[in-house]
Curated annotation (Swiss-Prot):
<dbReference type="Pfam" id="PF07724">
    <property type="entry name" value="AAA_2"/>
</dbReference>
<dbReference type="GO" id="GO:0051082">
    <property type="term" value="F:unfolded protein binding"/>
</dbReference>
<dbReference type="GO" id="GO:0140662">
    <property type="term" value="F:ATP-dependent protein folding chaperone"/>
</dbReference>
<dbReference type="Pfam" id="PF10431">
    <property type="entry name" value="ClpB_D2-small"/>
</dbReference>
<dbReference type="InterPro" id="IPR027417">
    <property type="entry name" value="P-loop_NTPase"/>
</dbReference>
<dbReference type="GO" id="GO:0016887">
    <property type="term" value="F:ATP hydrolysis activity"/>
</dbReference>
<dbReference type="InterPro" id="IPR003593">
    <property type="entry name" value="AAA+_ATPase"/>
</dbReference>
<comment type="function">
    <text>ATP-dependent specificity component of the Clp protease. It directs the protease to specific substrates. Can perform chaperone functions in the absence of ClpP.</text>
</comment>
<dbReference type="GO" id="GO:0046983">
    <property type="term" value="F:protein dimerization activity"/>
</dbReference>
<dbReference type="GO" id="GO:0008270">
    <property type="term" value="F:zinc ion binding"/>
</dbReference>
<dbReference type="InterPro" id="IPR010603">
    <property type="entry name" value="Znf_CppX_C4"/>
</dbReference>
<protein>
    <recommendedName>
        <fullName>ATP-dependent Clp protease ATP-binding subunit ClpX</fullName>
    </recommendedName>
</protein>
<feature type="domain" description="ClpX-type ZB">
    <location>
        <begin position="1"/>
        <end position="50"/>
    </location>
</feature>
<keyword id="KW-0862">Zinc</keyword>
<dbReference type="GO" id="GO:0051301">
    <property type="term" value="P:cell division"/>
</dbReference>
<dbReference type="GO" id="GO:0005524">
    <property type="term" value="F:ATP binding"/>
</dbReference>
<feature type="binding site">
    <location>
        <position position="31"/>
    </location>
    <ligand>
        <name>Zn(2+)</name>
    </ligand>
</feature>
Length: 421
């Protein structure tokens, strides 16, 4: 046969004599060797390139999406978050339903229920952010935190809401499919209420605009995300991210929301003080468990925004016992961390029980909840951490109550000369 009359593969140039099969298409041919090669390439999962900001398009399968039961979710949260039993149970159920919904969608099943976005109420340092972080760690999904006070509506100087999605995409190493089932936590959400007290009229207007802008990505939209962040401009390339299955958790202190609830319920009919300013913390926590959509609207959130959160739960102010437990019980408890740091220097760090309660009392007075604990301990132990590495005679350090309350020096136990030798 004349070589010129032989049919060849359009990709590799092999002739029909050199291959087992040659499949014809419109004016083209492909051999079995090239088909196998292409099949192998398609079977490989694409790798992301975060440094260049190039998105990957891997489609997630149900097999790599963890869907733990509510009890399992709460059990994991308990390892890191002290107290907040009601909040942890409520969130565990909401998160379970959310990811169960995603798994059903991945399996091409019809789903009639919507996503379970969560709104967390509660004072600073009550564990709102920690709960969200822990959830992301448990579920092994991308996670990012945003501050609502830095966001602005279009036309204002500040950060566009799409940049929140960009940060989630970056947390997912630009894997779009992973980002599309991640978790976004927006803190200080109460600060963008349109009628909140002590805020300028300009900020109220801007706050409502931010709520409107957030509404779109929270309810589910295809966001055009600038790969490098910043403001959008014409002729710019975008990464398209569908936010329909991203779990949004928002949190805020919502100061004085309890008074709005009391006014709705009728303060004299629910067993509280006649003076709205006289509520104890226990009263406030109890009132916040009765929050309704109308209370949040009265606070300054727009109805459409509140309507996107079908799970609204209160994180209570931490008690003295809970603050002590936070110091010592969680897997990553801060006292455990300092004990380990000192043990690296071959020094035993001992906290007496009264000292732990003194630290908790000091944190309580700071009005910032668990956040104050780390600062108190850092200030307490900083000088010791400076001196200890240069002093091999120190065997143990005992922190007592008067060390905290009266600024007395901790008890230092020294090694004998023989032990040092």
């Amino acid at each position: 046969m004349n070589k010129k009359n032989l049919t060849i593969c359009s990709f590799c140039g092999r002739s029909e004599k050199d291959v087992e099969k040659l499949i014809a298409g419109p004016s083209v041919y492909i051999c079995d060797y090239c088909i196998k090669l292409c099949s192998g390439i398609l079977d490989k999962k694409p790798t992301s390139t975060p440094s260049s900001g190039t998105p990957t398009e891997t489609t997630p399968q149900h097999s790599d999406l963890q869907v733990l039961t509510p009890k399992e979710i709460k059990k994991h949260i308990d390892k890191y978050v002290v107290g907040q039993e009601r909040a942890k149970k409520t969130i565990a159920v909401a998160v379970y339903n959310h990811y169960k919904r995603i798994r059903a969608l991945l399996n091409n099943k019809h789903v009639s229920y919507g996503k379970s976005n969560v709104l967390l109420l509660g004072p600073t340092g009550s564990g709102k952010t920690l709960i969200a972080k822990t959830l992301a760690k448990i579920l092994d999904v991308p996670f990012t935190i945003a501050d609502a006070t830095t966001l602005t509506e279009a036309g204002y100087v500040g950060e566009d809401v799409e940049n929140i999605v960009l940060r989630l995409l970056q947390a997912a190493d630009y894997n779009v499919a992973r980002a599309e089932r991640g978790i976004i936590y927006i803190d200080e959400i109460d600060k963008i209420g349109r009628t909140t007290a002590n805020v300028s009229i300009t900020r109220d207007v801007s706050g409502e605009g931010v709520q409107q802008a957030l509404l779109k990505i929270i309810e589910g939209t295809t966001a055009n995300v600038p790969p490098k962040g910043g403001r959008k401009h014409p002729n710019q390339e975008y990464i398209r991210v569908n936010t329909e299955n991203i779990l949004f958790i928002v949190g805020g202190a919502f100061v004085n929301l309890d008074k709005i609830i009391a006014k709705r319920l009728g303060k004299t009919t629910i067993g509280f003080s006649d003076d709205l300013g006289d509520f104890s913390q226990e009263d406030r926590d109890h009132l916040l468990t009765k929050v309704e959509t109308e209370d949040l609207i009265a606070f300054g959130m727009i109805p459409e925004f509140v309507g996107r959160f079908n799970c609204i739960v209160n994180c209570e102010e931490l008690s003295l016992d809970e603050l002590v437990a936070i110091l010592t019980e969680p897997t990553n408890a801060i006292v455990k961390q300092y004990i380990e740091l000192f043990s690296e220097e071959n020094v035993k760090l001992i906290f007496e029980k009264d000292a732990l309660y003194a630290i908790a009392k000091k944190a309580k007075l700071a009005k910032t909840g668990a956040r104050a604990l780390g600062m108190i301990l850092e200030n307490l132990l900083r000088d010791l951490m400076f001196e200890i590495p240069s002093d091999p005679t120190v065997e143990a350090i005992r922190i007592q109550e008067d060390t905290i309350l009266e600024n007395k020096a901790p008890v230092i136990i020294r090694r004998t000369p023989e032990a040092i030798a």
